[in-house]
Amino acid sequence: MKKEVVVVATMTAAATVVVAAVLLRQWKRKKQRQWRETQKILRKFARDCSTPVPKLWQVSNALVSDMKACLASSGTITTLNMLVSYVSPLPTGDEKGFYYGVNLRGTNFLILCARLGGKNNPISDLHKEEIPIPSNLMAATSKELFDFIAVELGKFVSEHPNTLAEELSKLGCIVSCPVEQSVVSDGTAIKWKSFSADSKVGKKLVSDFNKALEEHGVKLRVYAMVDDTVGNLAGGRYYNRESVAAVTLAMGTDAAYVEPANAALQWHGPSPKLGDMVISTQWGGFSSPHLPITIFDTCLDAESPNPGCRRFEKLISGMYLGEIVRRVLLKMAQETAVFGDTVPLKLMTPYQLSSPDMAAMHQDTSEDHKIVGEKLKKVFGITSTSPKAREVVSEVCDIVAERGARLSGAGILGIIKKLGRIENKKSVVTVEGTGALFLAASQMQMQNDDPDPDPEPGNDDDDEEPDIDDAHPDNDDHDHEHGNDVRDPNLN
């Protein structure tokens, strides 16, 4: 009897081992299938996001075509809604004096002041203060908003007075929204981001702002109001006369550039003194069949507040990069269990992943992707990840970041090509910056001086393309070989 029991126990143990081995093999095969599916999703996403040089040229050329069509007539239908900015002349670098600036952003505004020393002299006495806008003012009238800003400006000026001030000091003003103008000294906000009050759209902002300043006894007057990208171009031109464009790559995106006045039929006022003007391209709205749009981009666009609009912006701006990554990771989690058998709840929350967190994962070059693991835990509550899973997340971030960077480069290349400056002319492109001070200074200089006009920038319509490799937007040697430069005033 004992012998039979031993035999049965042995057979049972053997069967258990066999079953365990079978289950283990099945589990391994399942994991292998899931991993292959993960890789399949990753490879397809990489292919759909690919930006080979010929495609970048197609994007650049399409942008140039839309720019030309938009400038030809205000009634021409294009994906761009370019706006003439009546800033003329731009700073020359010779401006001197003490100036104030204000940058009206989405949820806050920045006040700053500084003394400009002219050529070869550093900026001095720089002071700045960032002030949050109370939530109740987001839906208030423009009068209430400007009253609040005027009071804060009054406090700032009392702390940092212009001791050599005239009766009224000049104030440069930048707003983070498109501004349609007939003169630089006034502007109409087309859409003011983050604000819901209808009264701020279509209002003459400068006159409202100056009225608030006067009512509160603040000895400042707004002499120029432009959008933030045009302001950045003004800042770049102060440092380098070869600055021909400025690009904003933040939560939103835009590009502004210097265009000969005779190329823009939308100019409704007197011709500028220096024969050129600043154009705000509003390139966030640019769209083309050549853009590498994936199923994730299509779904994001369909679920956005403005479906079918701002397609270029949704590929390159900080508002959307993290969300694109989240959507790819969600598909992997749902179909391949890359983060385990249960899909993390936070991974299903739209816009849970911010672009700064996505950028941190993109920049994680450690062997075990430690930062990626930390961000997955912090953002999505994923407490345990394998090295392979973290590597996949890193690759998704890389793909999205690279596509955005290369498309941005293609856009910049398109502007330089539109100006006919690719081959032989030095071109400086300013990225970000704080242009309000320089804007105020340039308008002051315009009143005091009549500078000698500069030659108009070249604007030949020769569409002959240089060698593709030499003009590669990601080629580090290109800027030096052809004299093109990208700089950031770094004043924020």
Label for each model-derived stretch:
Residues 1-169, 214, 239, 298-452, ...:
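ATP-binding/phosphotransfer module of carbohydrate and carboxylate kinases, centering on a glycine-rich
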Residues 103-105, 228, 454, 463:
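Acidic active-site catalytic centers that drive phospho-/nucleotidyl reactions
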Residues 105-109, 116-119, 136, 176-180, ...:
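Conserved beta-strand elements of beta-rich interaction domains across eukaryotes
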Residues 130-150, 154, 174-237, 242-245, ...:
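Glycine-rich phosphate-binding loop and adjoining helix at the ATP-binding site
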Residues 169-171, 243-245, 253:
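Generic beta-strand structural signal
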Residues 292-295:
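Condensing-enzyme catalytic core mediating Claisen C-C bond formation in acyl metabolism
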Residues 449-492:
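Asp/Glu-rich intrinsically disordered low-complexity tracts
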